């Protein structure tokens, strides 16, 4: 998993509330357990017409937001089913941080495991960031995980909270497999000792 330290990028505004995982990645595309390849179908039903052409008014289809790395979203983002394909699609598109007033618990935790930083802020601060994001590609927002600060294009600094363990994992690029590999030497030692103590196993 790629390390997350600091990003400075375009933020896309998506004020719609209750964006569920089926809206993020419709179930028709859940045909693979590979983490890549889902970005093209992110927000598919909002992003494309039935004939496959783009819907010009959808925020991520607008030229100024096609390379967005930050999403400023409405309340209760990621609700619905627990499919891990939702953060896979978001990460594959290139979005590394989502800011909202609240997230569904399973989506929230799955995001960290897939290199995405979900940030919870009060409504008034989300409103400030939403307004900043509406400025388009000329307004670049900075998210500094180590300092736990968001800086708007105007220089306003907004602090945020993040669980210390989840922060450690993102800063060091550790998913569940990476965390296990950190303990590889201890695991090998335990297995060797267990084999000596119980050779019949």
Swiss-Prot record:
Pfam families: Aconitase_C
GO-annotated biological processes: L-leucine biosynthetic process
Gene3D superfamilies in UniProt: Aconitase, domain 4
Gene Ontology molecular function: any one: 3-isopropylmalate dehydratase activity
Domain of life of the native organism: Bacteria
Pathways involved: Amino-acid biosynthesis; L-leucine biosynthesis; L-leucine from 3-methyl-2-oxobutanoate: step 2/4
Enzyme Commission number(s) from the entry: 4.2.1.33
Catalysed reactions, as listed in the record: (2R,3S)-3-isopropylmalate = (2S)-2-isopropylmalate
InterPro entries: 3-IsopropMal_deHydase_ssu, Aconitase/3IPM_dehydase_swvl, AconitaseA/IPMdHydase_ssu_swvl, IPMI_Swivel, LeuD
Keyword Ribonucleoprotein: no
GO cellular component: 3-isopropylmalate dehydratase complex
Keywords, ordered alphabetically: Amino-acid biosynthesis, Branched-chain amino acid biosynthesis, Leucine biosynthesis, Lyase
Family indicated by similarity: Belongs to the LeuD family. LeuD type 1 subfamily.
Subunit description: Heterodimer of LeuC and LeuD.
NCBIfam families linked to this entry: leuD, PRK01641.1
Known role: Catalyzes the isomerization between 2-isopropylmalate and 3-isopropylmalate, via the formation of 2-isopropylmaleate.
Protein name (record): 3-isopropylmalate dehydratase small subunit
Species annotation: Ruegeria pomeroyi (strain ATCC 700808 / DSM 15171 / DSS-3)
